[in-house]
Amino acid sequence: MESQNIRIRLKAFDHRVLDQSTREIVSTAKRTGAQVRGPIPLPTRIEKFTVNRSPHIDKKSREQFEIRTHKRLLDIVDPTPQTVDALMKLDLAAGVDVEIKL
């Protein structure tokens, strides 16, 4: 029978909060006896927005803003039922998007 894997994909705008959440997930999984692969840093998505500084004229004067979406990937190999329960009860920081695939 093929072993069950849990793939966790994390996204956040702040890389420090993302790394802290990743460390919490890894320590929880290792404490319950599962093997963890990762965290694997995925490419950062950079969105740039250009707007006019003035509402009426002066097209040459513009301002640029950017938002960076940082991503990490974790694989939990052979999770135990205790691992799944611990991950469900885990309270991560606000601002971190978590996608879990079995």
From Swiss-Prot:
GO cellular component: ribonucleoprotein complex; ribosome
UniProt KW keywords: Ribonucleoprotein, Ribosomal protein
Record field: transmembrane: none
Biological processes annotated in GO: translation
Coiled coil regions, renumbered to chain: none
Annotated Gene3D superfamilies: Ribosomal protein S10 domain
Record-linked Pfam families: Ribosomal_S10 (PF00338)
Keyword Ribonucleoprotein carried by entry: yes
Keyword Cytoplasm listed: no
GO MF term list: structural constituent of ribosome; tRNA binding
SUPFAM superfamilies in the record: Ribosomal protein S10
UniProt superkingdom: Bacteria
Family: Belongs to the universal ribosomal protein uS10 family.
HAMAP family: Ribosomal_uS10 (MF_00508)
Function: Involved in the binding of tRNA to the ribosomes.
Subunit structure: Part of the 30S ribosomal subunit.
Name by which UniProt lists this protein: Small ribosomal subunit protein uS10
Protein's organism: Rhodospirillum rubrum (strain ATCC 11170 / ATH 1.1.1 / DSM 467 / LMG 4362 / NCIMB 8255 / S1)
